[in-house]
Curated annotation (Swiss-Prot):
Modified residue annotations for N6-succinyllysine: 50
UniProt organism field: Oryctolagus cuniculus
Homology family: Belongs to the eukaryotic ribosomal protein eL32 family.
A Pfam short name: Ribosomal_L32e
The protein's name: Large ribosomal subunit protein eL32
Disulfide bonds: none
Length: 135
């Protein structure tokens, strides 16, 4: 079976790939880098002074058509069982399956076999599969 291709593959443009960091997180170890909105009355980041770190806002968002799209052109759908693959049957040209991390190796093998029959793409087909020697 040839590798599945998406129905359409638009050019994915990322407007902003840098992480927004918290104000003064570079200065103090106790302040983590995770973004928190500054709420102080005199805060220069909140007041958007020139030369300060940038605050995230709606303008940095991705294009609605390419949001959550993988570089392959598919969107992910998390699969926990073989039964959940039936949902992807009609939209296998736009969605691909991703096997959840808590699925057992036995069920994982069953999912991969069923995926081959239904012509659905999987992002992690080798998840939890060990070689024959180790078993």
């Amino acid at each position: 079976m040839a590798s599945l291709r998406p129905l359409v593959k638009p050019k994915i443009i990322k407007k902003w790939t840098k992480k927004f960091i918290r104000h003064q997180s570079d200065r103090y170890v106790k302040i983590k880098r995770n973004w928190r909105k500054p709420r102080g009355i005199d805060n220069r980041v909140r007041r958007r002074f020139k030369g300060q770190i940038l605050m995230p806002n709606i303008g940095y968002g991705s294009n609605k058509k390419t949001k959550h799209m993988l570089p392959s052109g598919f969107r992910k759908f998390l699969v926990h069982s073989v039964k959940e693959l039936e949902v992807l049957l009609m939209c296998n040209k736009s969605y691909c399956a991703k096997i959840a991390h808590n699925v057992s190796s036995k069920n994982c093998k069953a999912i991969v076999e069923r995926v081959a029959q239904l012509a659905i793409r999987v992002t992690n087909p080798n998840a939890r599969l060990r070689s024959e020697e180790n078993e």
